[in-house]
Each structure stands twice: as structure tokens, then as C-alpha cells.
């Protein structure tokens, strides 16, 4: 989570620089769920459309094109029927889909997901991983995801960055599976 926040410019690195080659407003971010998020007093549609607000400095309204994209993202995530419901009345899985739709409205090049399935039941978790994989493949959006679920990461990711207390690994899933890091971690 600290690395993610540094990539997003929310935390300043202790040393060095992080260069992404894209603008901050081209990044969608789905943070870890918090109690404050769970009690957000807005409609689903308002939450999803708020993903565009990083693009507007002083103009708090969405354009027609942005509203169409918000509807398209809600359709993709199968939450259209929830558009007028209050966000805080939704289940945890529905709330995560809403925030994923919001992040997709913000994203043009990169989406950063910080523990997107924490607290979700196994069926909803598997569905979220499938949706995220589909987004990556169909929309050609790079996905960076923090997860403690290494087995799911090996199933859905193309590359693994394993950051431990004493070691760090970065490489393809196949390289990771053959590494000493994976052998120690997965036993």
C-alpha cells in the first residue's frame, strides 16, 4: 500500500523519483475499503461519475461524453440497476464494483487496485478477479494490484512484484513460480 501511494503521488518517496510517463489524471485508483467509504452518502451514479472530477479543475459537472462513459462502466460491471440507490446501502461486493467503475472513469492508461477483494466472499472475489482480468485485456489498461492472495495473482497476473521483509522479486509469473522466493512463500 505504501508503494502504491508513492506511485500515485500520495506519499513522497524517501529518496529517488517515480516516473510513470503518464499524467496523474490518466490513473484510476481503487483504495482499500475503509469504514468511511462504506458509509458514503451519495448515489451510485454520483460516486461513479466522481471518477471524472480529477480532470476538471473548477468545473464540478460531467460532460455528456463522461456521463455516457459512466453508464457504460456501470453496464460493464452490472451495476446499472443500482444507479439511483444510496452507496452505503449496498453489499461489500456491490460497493467494490461501484468504486471499480469510478476508477475506470478516471483511468485512461493505468488502474491501481489496493486489495480490491478484501472482505469479499469467495464467489464475489473470483468474479472481481475475472472482471479485472477482462478490463486489462479488453480495454488495454495496465493494472497494478496489491494483493496478499499470491495464488490468485499467479492465475491472473502477467508479472509479479513480491515485496517481503528480506527479499524482493520482479518477473513473469513463470519466472516467479520457479524462483526461490515463491518456493519459500508457497510451501
Summary of predicted features, one role per range:
Residues 111-114:
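Catalytic Walker B motif of ABC-type/P-loop ATPase nucleotide-binding domains
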Amino acid at each position: 500500500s505504501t508503494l502504491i501511494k508513492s506511485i500515485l503521488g500520495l506519499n513522497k518517496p524517501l529518496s529517488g523519483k517515480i516516473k510513470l510517463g503518464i499524467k496523474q489524471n490518466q490513473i484510476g485508483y481503487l483504495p482499500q475499503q475503509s469504514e468511511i467509504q462504506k458509509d458514503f452518502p451519495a448515489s451510485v451514479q454520483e460516486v461513479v461519475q466522481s471518477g471524472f472530477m480529477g480532470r476538471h479543475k473548477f468545473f464540478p459537472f460531467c460532460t455528456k461524453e463522461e456521463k455516457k462513459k459512466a453508464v457504460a462502466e456501470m453496464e460493464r460491471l452490472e451495476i446499472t440497476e443500482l444507479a439511483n440507490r444510496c452507496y452505503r446501502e449496498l453489499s461489500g461486493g456491490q460497493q467494490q464494483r461501484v468504486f471499480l467503475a469510478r476508477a475506470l472513469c478516471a483511468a485512461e492508461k493505468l488502474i491501481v487496485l489496493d486489495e480490491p477483494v478484501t472482505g469479499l466472499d469467495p464467489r464475489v472475489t473470483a468474479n472481481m478477479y475475472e472482471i479485472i482480468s477482462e478490463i486489462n485485456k479488453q480495454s488495454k489498461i495496465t493494472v497494478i494490484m496489491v494483493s496478499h492472495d499470491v495464488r490468485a495473482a499467479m492465475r491472473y497476473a502477467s508479472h509479479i512484484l513480491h515485496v517481503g521483509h528480506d527479499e524482493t522479486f520482479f518477473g513473469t509469473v513463470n519466472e516467479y513460480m520457479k524462483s526461490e522466493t515463491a518456493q519459500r512463500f508457497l510451501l
